Amino acid sequence: MYKEPFQPTYEYALECDKHDELKDFQTEFYKKEGTIYLDGNSLGLLSKRAEKSLFTLLDSWKEYGIDGWTEGEHPWFFLSEKLGELTAPLIGALPEETIVTGSTTTNIHQVIATFYEPKGIRTKILADELTFPSDIYALQSQIRLKGLDPDEHLVRVKSRDGRTLSEDDIIHAMTDDVALILLPSVLYRSGQILDMKRLTAEAHKRGIHIGFDLCHSIGSIPHHFKEWDVDFAIWCNYKYLNAGPGGVAGLYVNKKHFNRLPGLSGWFSSRKDKQFDMEHTLTAADHAGAYQIGTPHVLSTAPLIGSLEIFKEAGIERLREKSLHITRFMLNLIAHELSDFGFTIGNPLEDEKRGGHIYLEHAEAARICKALKANGVIPDFRAPNGVRLAPVALYNTYEEVWHSVQILKKIMKDEEYKQFENKREVVA
């Protein structure tokens, strides 16, 4: 599919673009002329199909009013379940195990409220010190709600190098007092992929339920939850899945746990045929829909309809193949062109351990990001010293990667970054 061996040349980039099996999808997305967008790991670009599906649901509201819940091309009452079915192949799950609902953080609260049952000596939640802050805030809140002290009952596995986690260290921390584990599938800074299969097996050997935050992996790498027997997972849909800012999130619960009442119940936890009976005793759905809480955010869900159609056509295996190749091309270019400018590559270099973005460390990272934006390259900054660059398989080209590295080289060589203050913006 892609030309080998790697060559750090413009001609090689053009040749790779020529043979890219996914190149036709680039025209599906709105790409600003004169800009190279490398921030799809933070917010994916708008596709024409996502835009169309949003307008379709607006038209349903216009035409049907309240009857839009059961009428139109995409009836709202069943939309969360329908999109769950379309998402399931991306995580290797059954359709009934997947639901589109809530936000990442509310879904963390839901799964922790459902699965965290401190009893006897098993009172602790195991997480890690590199995970996204919102995960920690939610875990601390849930521990407090049980009347326990997060400082004592939340265990965070330490990183040996400040960038990555050792699976051996995580397994070593699976002690007899751990009741539940929540880990990232891909670390948001370094892009390290954790071995979810191994960690799940080791947790289950010890009688511990384990779940994963998929925010930086879903839509970028394949998952095989049915095979791995993961207990639960949560994710956002606005990064690689291109559902738009504030797009409704996702939640997975292994079918073996469907007998568990949701820790946080609401009207939409109900079985569909019972919901409008208005009973004060919940008859929970017998699938992942039980873990919904309130009324679906229909208009924030709508873009995902069109986006998931694209993923179905492209295929997650092909997307991963290109992602690995184009990020490897970028890494090789960085090594070839930027070795004299003080950058450190913060990613694992092994393909099987690297997610969809490149993570560069530099003391001047904040203002380097500002200089990149001033030159038409959109990265993002992550404190304290990280530049994230995500060439997304669906819409970025090898030519764009080549140009972005040349622009970065010029910024460093001419010290253009010194025009800017070395601190982050309000939104980094």
UniProtKB/Swiss-Prot annotation:
GO terms for molecular function: kynureninase activity; pyridoxal phosphate binding. It catalyses: L-kynurenine + H2O = anthranilate + L-alanine + H(+); 3-hydroxy-L-kynurenine + H2O = 3-hydroxyanthranilate + L-alanine + H(+). Pathway: Amino-acid degradation; L-kynurenine degradation; L-alanine and anthranilate from L-kynurenine: step 1/1; Cofactor biosynthesis; NAD(+) biosynthesis; quinolinate from L-kynurenine: step 2/3. Its cofactor is pyridoxal 5'-phosphate. InterPro entries: Kynureninase, PyrdxlP-dep_Trfase, PyrdxlP-dep_Trfase_major, PyrdxlP-dep_Trfase_small. Signal peptide: none annotated. The modification N6-(pyridoxal phosphate)lysine is found at K239. One of its GO terms (biological process) is anthranilate metabolic process. Keywords: Hydrolase, Pyridine nucleotide biosynthesis, Pyridoxal phosphate. GO terms for cellular component: cytoplasm. Its EC number is 3.7.1.3. Pyridoxal 5'-phosphate binds at T104, T105, F132, P133, S134, D135, D213, H216, Y238, W267, T295. Transmembrane segments: none annotated. It comes from the Bacteria. Belongs to the kynureninase family. Homodimer. HAMAP family: Kynureninase (MF_01970). Catalyzes the cleavage of L-kynurenine (L-Kyn) and L-3-hydroxykynurenine (L-3OHKyn) into anthranilic acid (AA) and 3-hydroxyanthranilic acid (3-OHAA), respectively. This is Kynureninase. The lineage of its organism: Bacteria, Bacillati, Bacillota, Bacilli, Bacillales. The gene is kynU.
